[in-house]
Curated annotation (Swiss-Prot):
Disulfide bonds: none annotated. Disruption phenotype: Resistance to the estrogen receptor-modulating drug toremifene. One of its GO terms (molecular function) is calcium ion binding. It comes from the Eukaryota. The breast cancer drug toremifene modulates the ability of CML1 to activate calcineurin (CNA1). This is Calmodulin-like protein 1. Ca(2+) 1 binds at residues 46, 48, 50, 57.
Length: 174
């Protein structure tokens, strides 16, 4: 049997009955939304609903939370925080994801997001870029709505959003 997949017979779930309220000392620094996202990712990818995730489920759950992890890192996390059976329970997952989320650099994350919009690598988000992202996200926004979004945040009035304008929009209020 490979250590990458769950065995047929599983240990009982190690979650307390009130696991939705279980927190670590660091998780108090997370927003309710962030804690909810961690719980939702775990529950979504714990496909057999036994309170434990294997290698593949851990990798996909971490990716869903915005962490693109390599095989070696996932294996290390399972070895250090999982059980002898190679499975990880919710409390360990919550602890790891809390640390990772709190260690994020918001400006770095926003620069990566900007690059997703700027797929033609012009250094600016154009109406065309915004239209593509809206379509990929399944948003049905009209041309006028998309243009209004650009106009509202286009500080230098060049018809596009550059990185500085994007950061100003996204970091407003922090």
């Amino acid at each position: 049997m490979s250590h990458y997949t769950k065995p047929k017979s599983r240990r009982p779930a190690t979650l307390p009955s009130s696991h939705s309220h279980a927190t670590t000392s660091n998780s108090r620094s997370l927003t309710e939304d962030q804690r909810g996202e961690i719980k939702e990712a775990f529950e979504l990818f714990d496909v057999d609903k036994d309170g434990a995730i294997d290698y593949h489920e851990l990798k996909v759950a971490m990716r869903a939370l915005g962490f693109d992890v390599k095989k070696g890192e996932v294996m290390k996390l399972l070895k250090e925080h999982g059980g002898e059976d190679g499975l990880m329970d919710f409390l360990a997952f919550e602890r790891i994801m809390t640390e990772k989320i709190l260690a994020r650099n918001p400006e770095h994350e926003l620069r990566r997001a900007f690059e997703l919009f700027d797929d033609d690598r012009t250094g600016k988000i154009s109406l065309k870029n915004l239209r593509r992202v809206a379509r990929e996200l399944g948003e049905t926004l009209g041309e006028e709505e998309l243009q209004a979004m650009i106009d509202e945040f286009d500080l230098d009035q060049d018809g596009e959003i550059n990185l500085e304008e994007f950061l100003a929009i996204m970091l407003d209020g922090e």
